[in-house]
Amino acid sequence: SEMCIRDSEGAARGHFAGNITRDGRVELAVGNYERNLNIQLWKNYSDVFRIRLQAPGGEEAELSTNIQGGKYTLELEQTRILVYLGEPLPYAVAQEIYLDMIPAEGSYINAGIWTIRLEPVVTVTGQYYLYLPAGSGIGESTGFYRATPQVTLTIPSTAAKVITVGAYDQVYDTYADFSGRGYADSTRTIGVAAAGLTKPDLVAPGVNIQAPDVYGSFTPVTGTSFATPIVSGAAALLMEWGIVRGNDPFLYGEKVKAYFRKGARPLRGETEYPNDRVGYGKLCVAESLLE
């Protein structure tokens, strides 16, 4: 198994998950000075939605989801919207509808509240997921109202045969809210049969970690990017114990993940394991070793 950062999107307001039978209206705040913004809508290919988009000034348009060529352009107020209609792929059963918003006039797209209305035409599951660009791709004021923190882990941490690492606050022994959330065994997401698949696998310290800087000193850093190297080092120690010292010559790959899961310890405030926040718990190499 390879080690993967889970990303720090848990509190970023960049994801909304809903069911069209009860969450057909989604509001998106667009901050000032956004030069462009893209929105991904993922849904079950069997579902057919009628989609309407309303600009901050009240002008609205219906998005055609059945058009030859799979792409077209429309304008709302001072914003040009490029619409791309995706299809299922050899490696994915879900459908993506991709909206790329750019200025039609001036340098910025319209700031304010954009509203996406989804109306069912043919409903099989009714599930849908909306995503904005991750990290620094958008301003701090841009995000969904009533955002969904679940399923905010990012590629490549979504792959099955990697060890996905989140972050926790080692001072308070609690989950770090910026750490992206995944899914547990009992959940299912569009295009992902998550039975038996848990993300993240575990968490490691990721708040105010002392790391070397370019000046030859140390500085406090925060993020899943600093939790993952801790688990990488722990994996190296585990494989040294198993392979180099002769305790287990086959201690690599998914077996390392299994040992980490077995040794993970509980965190304050988490009552059920595994879960979509901390997986099996916090890293503990000592508990992962066989007696």
Question: Language-model segments: which ranges?
Answer:
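Short, small-residue-biased leader/transition segments that mark boundaries at the very start
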Residues: 3-5
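Hydrophobic beta-strand segments within beta-rich accessory/binding domains
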Residues: 24-45, 49-53, 105, 111-120, ...
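Subtilisin-like serine protease catalytic core
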Residues: 34-37, 44-47, 158-161, 172-174, ...
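Hydrolase catalytic cores
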Residues: 38-39, 47-50, 54-56, 206-273
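Extended low-complexity, serine/threonine- and proline-enriched intrinsically disordered segments
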Residues: 47-81, 130-135
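Catalytic-core environment of secreted peptidases
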Residues: 57-65, 167-229, 287
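Beta-sandwich interaction modules
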Residues: 80-114, 121, 130-133
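C-terminal edge strands of extracellular/lumenal beta-sandwich accessory domains
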Residues: 122-167
